[in-house]
Amino acid sequence: MSSAQNIKKSIMAPVLDNNPIALQVLGVCSALAVTTKLETAFVMTLAVTFVTALSNFSVSLIRNHIPNSVRIIVQMAIIASLVIVVDQVLKAYLYDISKQLSVFVGLIITNCIVMGRAEAFAMKSAPVPSLIDGIGNGLGYGFVLITVGFFRELFGSGKLFGMEVLPLVSNGGWYQPNGLMLLAPSAFFLIGFLIWVIRVFKPEQVEAKE
């Protein structure tokens, strides 16, 4: 397999074949909290992808010099440093979105996807493959967030990226926003539906009967 094919596989596999939310069931809490708007889902995707990619790369660079007894602490220190950078950049340039994301940017530090890839992949792999793996898993996470955020904002408020798409009753149109879509349980339903759709096309992901 060529280098280009390896890169493509590393980036695309976490989107559908091994999605961190849909298959591994990681990072679900933030998926419920930040998907009421497509804008916040998109920014959270960028933030997690940035942190996952660079933390993977950084951990991989020093993996042979990290004592086994403190490896988790070192990984968390690297992840926390990157999260602080992301948080400060959002506060400086996207303050309104930063307020909407609230504590969930800081909680990227404990996101199972970020920590899991650092421990399971970056500690055992070279820097460049680790960087690509981080990008792929960030995009896999973002695929679910953006899909859920699209439907929640569209049907919950009749808007996308804050712009009216469905003519609202309050503005003389025909669409009455569905308030349920703005509540966290709707994200559970949508994620469940998305998992079902993925498994219809990829039946190998269905768990074997006990």
UniProtKB/Swiss-Prot annotation:
The chain crosses the membrane at residues 42-62, 72-92, 103-123, 131-151, 178-198. It is a multi-pass membrane protein. It is found in: Cell inner membrane. The keyword Endoplasmic reticulum does not apply. Its main location: membrane. Keywords: Cell inner membrane, Cell membrane, Ion transport, Membrane, NAD, Sodium, Sodium transport, Translocase, Transmembrane, Transmembrane helix, Transport, Ubiquinone. GO terms for cellular component: plasma membrane. It catalyses: a ubiquinone + n Na(+)(in) + NADH + H(+) = a ubiquinol + n Na(+)(out) + NAD(+). GO terms for molecular function: oxidoreductase activity, acting on NAD(P)H, quinone or similar compound as acceptor. GO terms for biological process: sodium ion transport. It holds the Pfam family Rnf-Nqr. The keyword Manganese does not apply. Its EC number is 7.2.1.1. InterPro entries: NqrD, NqrDE/RnfAE. Composed of six subunits; NqrA, NqrB, NqrC, NqrD, NqrE and NqrF. Belongs to the NqrDE/RnfAE family. NQR complex catalyzes the reduction of ubiquinone-1 to ubiquinol by two successive reactions, coupled with the transport of Na(+) ions from the cytoplasm to the periplasm. NqrA to NqrE are probably involved in the second step, the conversion of ubisemiquinone to ubiquinol. NCBIfam families: nqrD (TIGR01939), PRK09292.1 (NF006777), PRK12405.1 (NF009070). This is Na(+)-translocating NADH-quinone reductase subunit D. It comes from Vibrio parahaemolyticus serotype O3:K6 (strain RIMD 2210633). The gene is nqrD.
